[in-house]
A protein has these predicted regions:
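Mobile, glycine- and charge-enriched loop segments
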Residues: 82-118, 218-262
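Conserved SGNH/GDSL esterase-like catalytic core that processes O-acyl groups on lipids
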Residues: 70-156
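Alpha-helical cap/lid subdomain in secreted, periplasmic
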Residues: 2-9, 14, 122-241, 258
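N-terminal secretory targeting modules
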Residues: 1-80, 233-262
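Alpha-helical context
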Residues: 64-68, 72, 76, 114, ...
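Short amphipathic alpha-helical surface micro-motifs
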Residues: 64-65, 89-91, 182-184
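Phenylalanine-focused residue identity feature
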Residues: 13, 19, 29, 36, ...
Length: 262
């Protein structure tokens, strides 16, 4: 091979080497005031990363971790559960009792007919029940008797806060009212005051209603309780062991009934 061919091959080799090297140069380069964009085939082939995928993956991981920081890990120990509320407990509590039977929990059911956050907040009754039964988990279902209270955020906020103060550090879930009509703000108030992952918003759920048009039929209330439990597993701040029992109900370990407030 003569010298002219050797020269051409040498130039071609140098050009290919230069092209390959520059393809790994991610930010381009400048010569004499001119900017040149380098080739991207190395990144396209996955031979070099521009960092975008890694940054995206890291960001998604960080977001997932930060979104779960407020959630406690699943607690699989047996619980002593206190369930307080209004007449909605007639449908909810028997289904929760079935969950408790299956999972080794005890359940104290306390129905105060026609009660509200006002009644409970003024009475100090929750503190009395906590001192008597020593629950380590609390369910609350209140708000159904407060759908039409005017200026409710001003009128009832102190009593919601009083109840939360009585609950203290005990893990809890507050089941919101099963709206049959638009409310004046009880759900907004509860959303504002309750801790993240502790309020189950029921207003948009679908229910089969009993003849009074307000209370869900018993079968519909059982499904309501099932939805609450499922939500606790995925979105609740304090998930506990609540494996689903067969369809059906049971009876709470203790049942306490208070007549409507005067």
């Amino acid at each position: 091979m003569n010298k002219s061919y050797w020269g051409l091959w040498s130039l071609l080799f140098v050009a290919l080497m230069l092209f390959g090297i520059l393809s790994y140069w991610q930010d381009g380069f400048g010569v004499g005031g001119l900017n040149f964009k380098t080739a991207s085939f190395a990144r396209d082939l996955g031979l070099v990363s521009d960092g975008t995928a890694q940054v995206k993956k890291t960001t998604e991981t960080d977001e997932k971790q930060s979104s779960e920081l407020w959630r406690a890990p699943m607690d699989t120990t047996a619980k002593n559960i206190l369930f307080i509320g209004d007449s909605m407990l007639e449908g909810l509590a028997p289904r929760l009792a079935a969950y408790c039977d299956k999972n080794g929990h005890t359940l104290v059911e306390v129905i105060w007919y026609s009660s509200s956050t006002l009644c409970w907040g003024e009475s100090g009754r929750l503190t009395e029940l906590i001192n008597k039964y020593h629950p380590d988990y609390i369910f609350v279902c209140l708000g159904a008797n407060e759908l039409y209270v005017p200026d409710i955020k001003r009128a009832r906020r102190p009593f919601v806060r009083k109840l939360l103060a009585e609950i203290g550090d005990i893990p809890y879930v507050w089941i919101g009212p099963p709206n049959w009509d638009k409310d004046t703000g009880i759900n907004d108030l509860l959303k504002q005051e309750l801790d993240k992952g502790c309020f189950y918003f029921s207003a948009n759920d679908e229910f089969e209603r009993s003849r009074d048009g307000a209370h869900p039929k018993r079968s519909s209330a059982h499904k309501w309780m099932d939805r609450v439990v499922k939500w606790m597993e995925t979105e609740g701040a304090h998930p506990i062991r609540l494996s689903r029992p067969a369809d059906g109900i049971s009876r709470a370990t203790h049942i306490v009934i208070y007549q409507p407030p005067k």
